[in-house]
């Protein structure tokens, strides 16, 4: 698998904020639709501020790409997760494991995939948006 990631705007010391992270979730969801992905698994990790038996704890769902942002917005409304959160992780994964878009716990974004359309599309979008982009192989 190949990885690309970003956590910074070029030439700035501040990391990505919640608005930038939400924009990248929307951008990735749009890219998924454009390349013909029909469904993805979206999830948020365990939130220690919620009771263990909360119906909102650790949400996970399989949705179409056009429902991705709505899933995360619902998690924000339910106080399970927040765009730009520094301690809680979330992700958008292929049900077959062929890619993972990871929203890290340090406001970092990582795409792991072998699909060059996804990697090239996000790399180009991030560079156009002025992000520092790192690349590595597993």
Q: Where do the model's predicted regions map?
A:
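Structured alpha/beta or helical-core interaction and ligand-binding surfaces enriched in interleaved
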Residues: 1-138
């Amino acid at each position: 698998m190949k990885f690309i990631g970003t956590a910074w705007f070029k030439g700035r010391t501040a990391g990505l904020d919640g608005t930038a992270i939400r924009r990248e979730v929307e951008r990735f969801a749009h890219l998924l639709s454009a390349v013909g992905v029909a469904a993805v698994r979206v999830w948020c990790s365990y939130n220690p501020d919620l009771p263990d038996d909360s119906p909102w704890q650790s949400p996970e769902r399989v949705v179409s790409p056009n429902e991705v942002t709505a899933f995360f917005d619902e998690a924000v409304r339910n106080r399970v997760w927040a765009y730009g959160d520094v301690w809680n992780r979330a992700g958008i994964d292929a049900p077959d494991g062929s890619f993972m878009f990871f929203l890290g716990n340090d406001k970092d974004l990582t795409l792991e995939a072998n699909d060059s359309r996804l990697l090239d599309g996000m790399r180009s979008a991030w560079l156009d948006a002025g992000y520092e982009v790192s690349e590595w192989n597993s």
